Amino acid sequence: MAHIDPTLVGKVSSILTGRIPQAPPQEARAVVAGIRAMARRAPDIVAAVSKMDAAQLSATVPVYVLDREQWAAGTASSLGAVLGDELLSAHVGESQGGRLKALTAPSSALVSVEVGAGLALMAKSVLGQYDPLAPNADGAQVPGRLVLVAPNILEFQRAFDLDQRDLALWVCVHELTHAAQFAQAPWLRDYIISRARAMVKDATGSDASLALDSGPGGDISAIMSVLEGHAEFVMNAVPIGQLPSKRRLKTAMRTRRDNSSPWKKWLQRLTGMDMKMGQYAAGETFVSEVVKAVGVEGLNQLWDDPLNAPSIEEIASPLTWVHRVIGTDYLGRDS
């Protein structure tokens, strides 16, 4: 059985992402210190905006400020631990258009190279990531860890001449909203893992494509849309007084997402990143419509029980979810 080598995955990904932004040691240290300071501020903001009882627990999540290679290695390690090397390597082997099918047993090195190549585009783009699949740290009351990719934050800040501390805070609010979600809904981690394993297992047969509109894949698409949309909602609701350059940040982020070159858009479709962009939009619309109908407190009933998780159909019809989970008595109330 082939095993995923996170170190090799990181090295391959790093090579393919190209040069990182250069900074003198003093500036680099200041960037890292600023990112860490904003990670400490973010939990209070998440708690105030989201009104989630467990949001303050996100302050216990360990924070790692990493480079691209370290991010890719850590992501590969988490995926391998949760999905299992056997399932992950089998899917990688079968999803390459027949290239690896000719091999009865792809080597660990070959599978690791494939995974590294697959993570390369994301390694160059990701600003931060709450990783709920990482092992629990000592003393943490929430699973996982917060990862912030310093070179990418610096590159984005320079490209759009953004306030560095505001950008770091904005990213941290988004990612620690995810930590708050998992703290508020302890069932979330197993819900996602069980369906991810089932989806990948189903895709290792004759048809290696991942079904994302029905079955376990549909469940994952729906819950990921909610998680991403809710994090977008919270980060965009941070008061201007706490995030003075918020309008500039939102414009820069929108431009960054919209102005990808044709080859990059093709790669995004190939790696599934275009789906993540769609999740932001669909999920934020769902969250906004639910909040408009029943307020933030009504939305927060979503986290109470896995049966409250919306279906893929309900993502497109938020009031259908409101009727099913909350009932019609709440409709039209002040939010």
Regions found by a protein language model. Name each.
Residues 38-151:
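Auxiliary, metal-adjacent structural segments of Zn-dependent hydrolase domains
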Residues 45, 179, 183, 234:
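Short alpha-helical functional segments enriched in proximate histidine and acidic residues
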Residues 190-231:
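Acidic/histidine-rich catalytic neighborhood
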Residues 138-158, 195-211:
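A short mid-domain helix/strand-loop element embedded in enzyme catalytic domains
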Residues 228-335:
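Pan-zinc metallopeptidase signature
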Residues 154-171:
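Short pre-active-site segment immediately N-terminal to the catalytic Zn-binding motif
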Residues 1-79, 165, 300-335:
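N-terminal low-structure segments adjacent to metalloprotease catalytic domains
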Residues 175-192:
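Catalytic Zn2+-binding segment of zinc metalloproteases
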